[in-house]
Amino acid sequence: MAPSTPLLTVRGSEGLYMVNGPPHFTESTVLPRESGRNCKVYTFSKDGTLFAWSNGEKVNIINVANKGLLHSFDLPKAVCLEFSPNNTVLATWQPYTTSKDGTAGTPNLQLYDMKTGACLKSFIQKKMQNWCPSWSDDEIICARNVNNEVHFFENNNFNTIANKLHLQKVNDFNLSPGTQPYKVAVYVPGSKGAPSFVRLYQYPNFAGPQAALANKSFFKADKVTMLWNKKATAVLVIASTEVDKTGASYYGEQTLHYIATNGESAVVQLPKNGPIYDVVWNSSSTEFCAVYGFMPAKATVFNLKCDPVFDFGTGPRNAAFYSPHGHILVLAGFGNLRGQMEVWDVKNYKLISKPVASDSTYFAWCPDGEHILTATCAPRLRVNNGYKIWHYTGSLLHKYDVPSNGELWQVSWQPFLDGIFPAKTIKYQAVPSEVPSEEPKVATAYRPPALRNKPVTNSKLHEEEPPQNMKPHPGSDKPLSKTALKNQRKHEAKKAAKQEARSDAAPTPVPQSAPRNTVTQSASGDPEVDKKIKNLKKKLKAIEQLKEQAAAGKQLEKNQLEKIQKETALLQELEDLELGV
């Protein structure tokens, strides 16, 4: 029988230990405290029944229910651990090393049988990135990326490769959640003028030009993040470039793409320019939330047609977290932001609370869907380390501060399978707490002596937008429907066009002091130059259409790709002509 709340595991300079969840927060006897700084890594199994950790000498595995030691492996350098979904296999990874004479190193990725303790297979895995094999939820298939192709194993038989997915230089892949039919998303970066692409396949149908379930191509991508929804019906792809050629952002440029297993794909249109900070699926698999745009960032919920469902307006935020049941959404600003959180009821789109977890670097929902963990961990921040447990209504239930000379490296909840904790009715009143709530200190702006005796003017650097259903609509208490909003915009556009036509028909007289060589936007005065400008604009429009076709997945001809490569030169030529250079 599951405990009332999951355990908390804490790893830091004080050692490795477990804490009972709310309401007690006492140290648990499940794991005797491992003192010292030698613990490098720990992990729970997916259902929370097994716990493994490395203490710098051995990797130990215990049964959480009876506290019994199951296995102990002599792996002093292990820094990564992960259980397979059904607790059949433990994967361990150690840094890859070669001998001094230059001979190849020994295999550093081990797969252990949890029943017998025997090593099923060892592989050489040089990179820590994507080190762990990916299993389907029923463990029927398991996949690894080996030398730019994906190898598939069946029924945990790692001595025989059951299938291979070979494309030109597969950079990354993502196995779908759930059981049969199994699907896999693969990413191939672009090269030699060809676009990057993400393709979806159904295992084991990889052969032939029509084998892919869906395909999405894009030019602006140095790396991608692929996110399956829970029902494995669609993937969200965040495509990122390392450098933003427009100079708008230091952190490169991001675009968000939607790809469904039925072949549909789309570019998700984000109303505000700027970085994409976070994208998360709701557990219902019918909608997703994106946090994006230059600060203050916007947050919007989209449906499967990529249409916006609800706009949360703007605010100091860079992360989004749905509760395990999908009925609550937390929008937060962590890292270099102050730690403000907004807790929303996403069924009614109603704000529940706005707690502040200052200096937080970590956030996690408790599997019960009621409690929240925030923490300040090293090495991200080496001062004021500690963790806090909140109720989603905004009450701070527990707080632990690490001593000033100590550090907190990791803290997390014990996981549980879906359905163990039923969804409860949402409360809006803050639950009682014995921990006093911390009022964040508001930093006052510097005021020069001459202004100190005068009233403070309330001015903001940015005007924050309210959520969509809070925007005032004249003559109506309810927000306008999508159709009504569209008609209103059309009417406003017509009105603006009429006013523009009138102003063109009756231009205002130019003052005598105005310079005579002012160039109008429509003409340069030289018919030959105007003709060149018109032709250049025509070519640029054709290039834009080709780019849209490529983004939609169409295979372009060689001469069409060459046209796209000429875009920069054409833009420069157009700019020179318009400036009269």
UniProtKB/Swiss-Prot annotation:
Residue positions, PTM Phosphothreonine: T5
Disordered: annotated segments: 432-533
Residue numbers carrying N-acetylmethionine: M1
Bias (Basic and acidic residues) ranges: 494-503
WD repeats: 23-63, 125-163, 356-401
Coiled coil (residue ranges): 527-578
Keyword Nucleotidyltransferase assigned: no
TM spans (from-to): none
Modification N-acetylalanine occurs at: A2
GO cellular component, one term: eukaryotic translation initiation factor 2 complex
Keyword Mitochondrion among UniProt keywords: no
Disulfide bonds: none
Family: Belongs to the WD repeat EIF2A family.
Protein name: Eukaryotic translation initiation factor 2A
